[in-house]
């Protein structure tokens, strides 16, 4: 053998020493050999690292770590894995069967030398984890609409599937909100009303209240036409106004049980705070989970392709139909990735003239969007003022159609604005040249600003009418008692009308627009007008905004109408089946697919915006606007929030001092500073973690280059050997 061949073989020998993670290492020490230092310095990874090091000493130190004895490394690996066997299963390690058996033998050997107490702890820990795994598997089978959502994912992709998963989350959220209100407010009243327990009502005494402020006109009696019941059912007036559906029904101070008195005003306020806090925590928790997934998947696009192609298939699938669904789902995800890659390449290839042109066009189109929003807000304001001024004056003189039109005028204008503006925004955004994912997010932002701002305009208009009047009733009662004797109930009626009318519009559009359009496209496809119209696409931004809009109404209205979450739950359940039927039979898949990882996080972010906007009018209503003196549980308080100081005054003096100290400015300012410091710490920690992730990604890239270099050297050595 020539000297060059021997040298080449020596160079080829280190091919068995690539940079491998510990979990991929073989435990056989004979598989390792100590390569020369000079050869390691020829690796691309070493050269890249050497350029970054400032001293030779650090490089030598790093080289020394690479030259550790493989025997000691192998034994350290065995010890480390054996120590972790108590907390993790062997199946979690990327080892072959023989090595897993070897580790299992090590585990059994270690168990013999443990005390009975340690053996029992390890055995109970394993049993508990096995039980949790089985319970987790069982709960996945109990998920609401699990099979329906998986079928939608396979046929239409993960983007549309994320909408239905989001709808399922809102169903569960509203159900929990209703249970909170039911347990804290409705259940004590029902137990007393139907004599289930030995309890009685404590009626509210009207103290220091002017008699004029306590007047609450009763609904007209006598001959009532049949259509009046329909109006009452659709608007929440008449017979529904006096039921437990609205705030004005709860005119009791408490429920007296055998040993204590249940404070209903306090429970009513606590239920409101509880459902808002629960909604906030639940949404933030799900948003953080979605943000983690979004952050991981958005780092490296090539890695996403590799994961889907080489590791995307679920080999546990044995059913033919489920295999087809999984195949379709992977195809849609790959199409979404390729479409986004095409948009990125197109953006990268733009010239400076094209960039200036597209940004100028976007600026002009955004001015049009702002003009449309301003016109809608003004129309809602005018409609609300007109409806409130004519509702009490002339409603008894009107016929059925005029009566219903006056009652529903704000809801009609809001619904028309919500129906027209998304179509305008969808037409506008086509000329702005964004990626499919960003198109959806920007359209949702515009529509959410439109839809949620319309609710804010309505509530602001109602608030201005409630707190302003021409006579002396505002000075006497604190609000416009003549027009709004029980203003909380009337705000609840407006929220009720918005929810009912929104539900009617969703059903009407599906049954009388989407379904006939499908029939025309199917049986009259030769007509040019029908060809231009085309088959309906499932518009995710519009549908998401629809349910976020409905949920925001529910959050605002639950204080004024305690049963509104139950109505919202039934509404969303029906919407799920209606939208599923519409998707399967009247819609076609979108020609521009998009990924769901971004959508899930963004849907929750939009929902969080809706929750924040709902908290603002509720906070003002509870803390600023005087409570009605003619109805509701807070007639003895100037504002709803006054029930909290009254309750605190009944506590022991030491507890009162503690609460006053915690809520004082002397505590709030240092607490806020500490929170800011903690937040800055976590921001810095997140930045450090991100830098580590970048370094690890670079290390993975360098390892692949090392492997290519070693394969090249091995090929050269084999060629020299043959020669």
Curated annotation (Swiss-Prot):
- For the modification Phosphoserine, the affected residues are 89
Q: Which residues lie on this side of the membrane: Cytoplasmic?
A: 190-219, 285-362, 426-494, 577-601, 687-723
User: What is its membrane topology?
Assistant: Multi-pass membrane protein
- Which GO MF terms are attached to this record? ion channel inhibitor activity; mechanosensitive monoatomic ion channel activity
InterPro entries linked to this entry: TMC, TMC_dom
Where would you say this protein principally sits, based on its record? membrane
Give me any GO biological process, just one: sensory perception of mechanical stimulus
Q: Which Pfam families match?
A: TMC (PF07810)
Q: Which residues cross the membrane?
A: 169-189, 220-240, 264-284, 363-383, 405-425, 495-515, 556-576, 602-622, 666-686
Keyword tags:
Glycoprotein, Membrane, Phosphoprotein, Transmembrane, Transmembrane helix
Which PANTHER family does the record associate with it?
TRANSMEMBRANE CHANNEL-LIKE PROTEIN 7, TRANSMEMBRANE CHANNEL-RELATED
Summary of the function given for this chain in its UniProt record = Acts as an inhibitory modulator of PIEZO2 mechanosensitive channel in dorsal root ganglion (DRG) neurons through physical interactions or interference with the interaction between Piezo2 and the cytoskeleton.
Family under the similarity heading: Belongs to the TMC family.
This one is known as: Transmembrane channel-like protein 7
Per the UniProt entry, what species is this protein from, by scientific name? Macaca fascicularis (Crab-eating macaque)
